[in-house]
Amino acid sequence: IYRRIDDLFLDPEAFRPDSMLGVPGLMRAWKAGNVALANAPGAGVADDKVVYAWVPDMIRYYLDEEPLIPNVPTYRTMYPDEMQHVIDNIGDLVVKPANESGGYGIVIGNRATRDELDDTIARIRADPRGFVAQPILSLSTVPTLVDVDGQPAVEPRHVDLRPFILTGEYSYVTPGGLTRVALPKGSLVVNSSQGGGSKDTWVIDSMFSTSPNAGER
């Protein structure tokens, strides 16, 4: 199990009893050796966004291989030259707190006011290790059922698709993925904690999609 939620919400039997996010009994199963937890309780290395920038180096070091998929360019403001690049180009970047999750604290440069950008630069200078920055990616839009002034309407909303790779005896890419949608109009933040949602992802079998009688099947 890859843990992404905070320790306190992981298991209502062991931590916060009011947690609706965790799995009752998970800590007992973990201690008994019946399940493995990546990003184990008490550790937070997988939650640190700065680590992402070193993933290609980790692959080379631990696997002695070259990454097959390139990383999104990630600027670590802990390094003076990268910090200066972020400051000089902040209007074209998205700045993220290194240890926040759920979309909190994110500043999207081309959608922020000058005051917000200046405040972000000041916070970066005060805590260089606490931030990373990446280019702003263009998200696709899909027709989405939304509420407009109390009435249902279909309007475009930004989405991202997250495919997953499962590894057991063999490794494979799942046919489909998690589609997250930014429900506030114009928003690029798809996190549910920021008002985002999810959508079904349908993968059409090419054999059926090209058949003249596909609609009858």
What are these regions (language model features)?
Residues 2-217:
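Domain-scale recognition of functional cores that engage charged ligands
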